[in-house]
UniProtKB/Swiss-Prot annotation:
Residue ranges of coiled coil: none
Lineage: Eukaryota, Viridiplantae, Streptophyta, Embryophyta, Tracheophyta
GO BP, sorted A to Z: pentose-phosphate shunt, non-oxidative branch
Pathway(s) where this gene product acts: Carbohydrate degradation; pentose phosphate pathway; D-ribose 5-phosphate from D-ribulose 5-phosphate (non-oxidative stage): step 1/1
Family matches, as Pfam families: Rib_5-P_isom_A
Coarse class of the protein's main subcellular location: plastid
A GO CC term assigned to this protein in UniProt: chloroplast
Gene: RPI4
Listed name of the protein: Probable ribose-5-phosphate isomerase 4, chloroplastic
Species annotation: Arabidopsis thaliana (Mouse-ear cress)
Length: 296
């Protein structure tokens, strides 16, 4: 049993208890792929083969692994291995990839039923499987953080695809925070005071090298929000506590932390694909983590 307690300047006073049990298994996967292929390609094939079923509505993520998964899903539909699958794209990139490979699309709206979603996470906290999304990849992705998070959260089940080094405890680096643009500076100062000594706060700019204030060309999303990158230079002890504390700040619209109770992380290592699944247990009142190591 692991107890996350208030041990850092940004932890809350309440404790979160996680109960976990591991059951590792090894068996062959992706037999049609050679050992030289990208680890993320193997992870993408494993995700489609093991989680996508005919008749599903699928949230189509964004990123390198998601591109591989979308392409493979299109091939499976074209060959007849899968049928009646509809994709809900999380970005213009995933919509374009899906259209290229012949996947029927339905665009996201409130109330749409999504059976399963996959997405590239920027990082995942070990054991809790809390994911970080929305770190800067390209300026075209900045406008889709809220949509990506919404689709993953409403899906009945989700998979985050990552590389081995992206899965660990004590994550560092940027946590994107969407804020009201009119009073962004006051919000940034409050966040900076809250994590003084642990993080820097930069307003994301649409061009490079604009400094912490975002210069003359800050990112403004289609909903009128600025994006603050809260860049942690020391390990974050609890992403759950961090998410709760950010949610309490006036003017914070949302952030790139996803706490999903039914999710799996598919970890692409050099020679194997490993999966870790999170499920809630009403009887135990906590979280159980199951692991499987899938040998290439």
């Amino acid at each position: 049993m692991v107890t996350a307690t208030a041990s850092t300047p940004f932890s809350l006073s309440s404790s979160v208890v996680f109960t976990r049990r591991r059951n590792f298994k090894r068996f062959p996967v992706c037999a049609s792929l050679s050992p030289e292929v990208s680890p993320l390609l193997r992870a993408a094939h494993h995700t489609v083969d093991n989680y996508v079923k005919s008749g599903m509505i699928i949230g189509l993520g964004s990123g390198e692994a998601s591109d591989f998964a979308i392409r493979y899903l299109g091939q499976q539909l074209g060959s007849g291995s899968l049928h009646n699958v509809v994709g809900v794209p999380m970005s213009a990139r995933s919509a374009s990839e899906a259209a290229k490979y012949g996947i029927p699309l339905e665009y996201y709206r409130d109330g749409v039923q999504i059976d399963f979603a996959f997405h590239d996470a920027d990082a995942v906290e070990e054991n809790t499987l809390i994911a970080v999304i929305g770190r800067r990849r390209s300026s075209q992705e900045d406008d889709y953080i809220l949509k990506q998070k919404s689709i993953v959260k409403v899906a009945d089940e989700a998979v985050f695809m990552i590389k081995e080094e992206q899965y660990k405890a004590g994550l560092e680096g940027s946590i994107p925070v969407l804020v009201q643009s009119l009073n962004w500076l006051a919000i940034a100062e409050e966040i900076d005071d809250l994590y003084l000594g642990d993080a820097e706060v930069w307003r994301r700019a649409s061009v490079e090298n604009e400094g912490p204030l975002g210069g003359d060309f800050p990112i403004v999303t289609s909903d009128g929000h600025n994006i603050l990158d809260v860049i942690f230079t020391t390990p974050i002890r609890s992403l759950a506590d961090l998410a709760t504390s950010l949610d309490k700040i006036d003017g914070v619209v949302d952030h790139g932390l996803i706490i999903k109770t039914r999710c799996t992380v598919v970890i692409a290592e050099e020679t194997v694909v490993r999966s870790v699944t999170l499920q809630t247990s009403a009887l135990e009142g906590g979280v159980r983590t199951y692991g499987q190591t899938l040998q290439k």
